[in-house]
Amino acid sequence: MQRLGEEGLIRVFGVAGYKNSGKTTLIVDLVRELTRRGWRVGTIKHAHHSFDIDHPGKDSYLHRAAGAAEVIVASASRWAHIRELADEPPASLDELLGHMGPLDLVLVEGWKHGTHPRLEVRRSDAPAPRLAGHDAAILAIVSDLPLPEES
C-alpha cells in the first residue's frame, strides 16, 4: 500500500501480532536486510502506553515539564519532535505517515486492525487469537510452528 508522506507516496507494510509475538525482532531483521540492500527504510511503532524519549534533567525534558506543547531537539546528525497530545485524540497512522520523509518503505509495528497490508507474527510460547482469516489486510503469517488449518 502507498500513503502520502512529506515527499509524495511511500510504501507502507506492517507487522502485527500480540505482545511478545516477535514483531520487533522481525522488524529489526527486515530493516537490517533492506538497508543492506540499499533501501531507505523508516519505521513507526505503536505504543499502547505512555513513553518518554527524553530523560529527567535534560533540557528538552525540562521544556516539556514546564508546559511546552511541542519540543524539537536538533543536532548536526538528527532531530526529534515531541508533541504532547493532552486532550487531543491519538494521531492516526495516516497522520504520522504524513511526517515521514522520502523513503523506499515504512514498516509499521502494531496497528493490528489497520487497513495497510500486514504480516501476522505468532509465537508458540505467546498464544493469542489469530488475526488472519478475520482481516483481509493480513497477507501472511510468520510463526515458529506449523499452523493448524482453520475449521
Q: Where is each model-derived feature located?
A:
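Conserved lysine of the Walker
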Residues: K23
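N-terminal phosphate/diphosphate-binding loop that engages ATP/GTP or pyrophosphate donors
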Residues: L4, D29-A91
